Amino acid sequence: MEEGGGSGVGGMQGAASNLLDAGAQAFYPAVGAPFPFQQLPHQLYCPQPPPPPYQVMPVPPPPPPVGLPVPPLPATMAPQPGYCVPAAATVVDGPASRAVVLSLVPPHAPEDEIARAMAPFGAVRAVDASAVASEGVATVYFFDLRSAEHAVTGVREQHIRQQCRLGQLYAAAAAAAASSPTWPPPAWDWPHDDNRGLVLGQAVWAHFAAASTVPDDGASRGSLVVLNSLPAMSVFELREIFQAYGDVKDVRESALRPSNKFVEFFDTRDADRALHELNGKELFGRRLVVEYTRPSLPGPRRRGHVSHQPLAPTPPRLQAAWRPAPAPSQSAQPSSSGSGKAREGVVLLRRSSGKGSSGSQSKGGGNAGHERKSKGGKSAAAACSTAASASSSTATAPSKQSQKGGGGGGGRGGSWRGQKSGWEARFLFKEPEAAAAAAGDAAASETHEPASCKDTRTTVMIRNIPNKYSQKLLLNMLDNHCILSNQQIEASCEDEAQPFSSYDFLYLPIDFNNKCNVGYGFVNLTSPEAAVRLYKAFHKQPWEVFNSRKICQVTYARVQGLDALKEHFKNSKFPCDSDEYLPVVFSPPRDGKLLTEPVPLVGRSPAPSSASGASSPPKSCAASVDPLAQELMTAPSSSGDGASSASSSNAHADEDDVHGETGGDRGDDAGLDLELQRLGYTD
């Protein structure tokens, strides 16, 4: 043991033995450390239980496959006689009219091609294709209202048919792709004409034009009015008479005048034929007076149509594109060629129509040709309608201005240039009354206000007379007007003689200071018809003398009749030195051929001396004007028609005087000769 122990550890003799001794003690260093090692207390280890395993949701099984059925091929259906239009095509979005608006029109489609596409529905009157290139919109006008209705229905039906064709073609293509590589030809199930309602092979859409863009005159609506039928004649009897000329849409009786009856045709050509055949025809002992109805007056009734406007309104450029065809004239109106040149307005007015105008207007004659009775057995009421439509704005414009001016005394007098008229509406000529009185018929259309056409007033007031105009020039103007009017009456009247134009009173108020008129004058005609003829010839016409820019205005005077005028000027004296400044009467009446000398109606008082007038300041112009003349005005003198007119006469006298005269008789004859030479009536 000792050998083994000594030799193994100390003398390294037992090198082959294990160097580690399992029985050796733990080694601790002999040197004391500053922080002696402390044995840690015994720790207990408590392991946590393992978490429960996660529950994995099972994946739902995929849904069973659903097979989409292949759409069956459309079955071929035989055409059925009871075929009806689809419900969508029967919807009408506006009031039916003869104007049809087409949209989605190919931009390169010409007018003739559009007319050719619409011709299967009925006769086409006109086509407006001005907006096709920019908006694809065209307006087609038909003669027959039923043709327009068929066109709207047919075009919409064709449009819906094309949409259904697309669906059928898609279904056929899907079925062909699943079965065979080639497409079978589709079988259409609607009996139809493939080209009906297509424009250049393209489907379009149609709707009726807006009511505000459709012409409202009788010629465009096929509407006639019978003015003097027997009140006992029923609408059924009248329908049978007019039914011989075409299909009648409606016959109704005027609520205000039982003798006036309205007849509306489906076709405007039938209405025109009935007008020419029945106007002036004897029926039950009475001559019929047939004419086109006039346009409706603007108002709440007209504006009430707004709720019926189509969903797709007419483009703005189409609203002014309508150009109604001129209605055939009721009778030829030859221009009068009497003794030399009828010089109405020789030194008065420049007619608005040119020298080359024909028909109802002759040179210088103006509208006077409308008053005469038409030839060929036709009633004068037809010419009355033409005259009323030709100058429909002559009385309405002053009426609107008078409403703005606040009645009868709102305007300033004098030249009336650029100012609003202020006379009362009761002194204005009413156009329906004027036309009916000129034609000798008391009946009027229901579209106008129910006013009596038997106006008995004969005294008129001529306004806006150039201040250099004298009584001699005014007499010459009236004489030529009477000559021309009477020549037309003699040339046209065959059955019923109308009263000739003549006058028996004339007064041109003068400013006694500057010897110039104050801008207005008074004339009493011998008949209401003559007053209407003077109004129609001179109203709203420019003057042609002294380079004046004034526009003539003609109204009724406040004092009416020769007897009332004589009573008005009774016991009056004017402070003037010439009879030319006085109101004058003519006995017998003067008509241009019978040149009755004027007889002063009042006396003259001594005029103030010129020396005293030159040294003293000028008096007020209102004091130098006859106050009785101001009372003849249609409005009180406070309105400016009297004194204000006189106060402005000085300025207008200088403006209208191109001859350098200051008034009086000195420039009258010379001015008349110069004007006649300038107009070509003298050498």
Swiss-Prot record:
InterPro entries: EAR1-like_RRM3 (IPR034458), Mei2-like_Rrm_C (IPR007201), Nucleotide-bd_a/b_plait_sf (IPR012677), RBD_domain_sf (IPR035979), RRM_dom (IPR000504). Residues 294-417, 596-683 are annotated as: Disordered. PROSITE patterns: RRM (PS50102). Residues 404-416 have a biased composition (Gly residues). One of its GO terms (molecular function) is RNA binding. Disulfide bonds: none annotated. Residues 328-340, 379-403, 605-624, 637-651 have a biased composition (Low complexity). One of its GO terms (cellular component) is nuclear speck. Keywords: Developmental protein, Repeat, RNA-binding. Residues 659-669 have a biased composition (Basic and acidic residues). Disruption phenotype: Plants produce threefold the number of leaves, and leaf size and plant height are strongly reduced compared to wild-type. Shoot apical meristem (SAM) shows a higher rate of cell division and internode elongation is significantly reduced. Some inflorescence branches are converted into vegetative shoots. Highly expressed in shoot apex and inflorescence apex, at intermediate levels in roots and at low levels in leaf blade and leaf sheath. The keyword RNA-binding applies. Residues 98-177, 223-295, 458-559 form the RRM domain. Pfam families: RRM_1, RRM_2. Probable RNA-binding protein. Involved in the regular timing (plastochron) of lateral organs formation. May regulate the rate of leaf initiation and the duration of vegetative phase. Seems to be redundant to the function of PLASTOCHRON1, but to act in an independent pathway. PANTHER family: RNA RECOGNITION MOTIF-CONTAINING. Plastochron is defined as the time interval between leaf initiation events. This is Protein terminal ear1 homolog. It comes from Oryza sativa subsp. japonica. The gene is PLA2.
